[in-house]
């Protein structure tokens, strides 16, 4: 009976000592949190291993994350994963669609995003671009003749329009001279002509008798204007003038119309400020609706694909610039010892408990072996 009691005692003591030793060793990883002094003498094994080596642990965790967890190869593999790409594209399409179907005005959305003075800046920049384009256009075209400056189609239209212009001028001339106003103007012209030639007027009066000169001249003028030969003559004159104009420099226009006047006229016609204001008062949905399908089905997938491709090609550079090791090191260094202990225990609680039980098991086995040795040595 004493033999079995001794074996049980040695086994139990071995298990208790082994289990408690491992439990104490685990506790000494974290406790005490701070060094303990007796006078000026620091008690050995204080503070615990992890509090003592916290800074080194932070450095090693940073290296571990960069070298073994968030590696360029691993991230690159994830970015090129087809399922990941499909999911990202779908997410982007949903988010972009929420934005472009928003019924709030562009003005409100920009103000919400703290983008100030949009209307003034947009108006100023558009007017600046238009002004620069006009100046560049004029600077180039002022070196040309009208024949070089105008497109071939314009040349054809003008040349085809000359006969019609001649007919129009003659028709208006006939209408004018048939009117009372035209007759009065013609009469004045005749009177002015003969006023400087007094004897000639008396001679003409002898031939015409009681009939006024204007009554004789008016029908002849109208007849002259209505003749085909007159039309052809006027057409030839206009054609010659057109040929002369084609050979003249566009720069001559500057003598009649200043550049700034042209710019001012264009800006006034375009009404940039009014146009920008109307545009900003539209809802995001109104602006984007015509191109919504294109944005969702083409632009977003293309942009995501290009972004992923760029990210894959530059992932190493991105990670280097992020300095992940330093970030992890700084974060771990800011942890209190208590928080660090809770963090480690939350991950390894079961494993550490099993280590304690293993210590008890080994201690018990050693105690049992000791009991058996004592039994055989008697």
From Swiss-Prot:
Topology term for the membrane: Single-pass membrane protein
Superkingdom assignment: Bacteria
Keyword terms, alphabetized: Cell membrane, Membrane, Transmembrane, Transmembrane helix
Compartment list: Cell membrane
Disulphide bonds in the chain: none
CC per GO annotation: plasma membrane
Keyword match Cell membrane: yes
Keyword Glycosyltransferase (UniProt): no
Transmembrane segments: 357-377
A UniProt-annotated Pfam family: DUF445
Family, similarity comment: Belongs to the UPF0754 family.
Listed name of the protein: UPF0754 membrane protein BCB4264_A0915
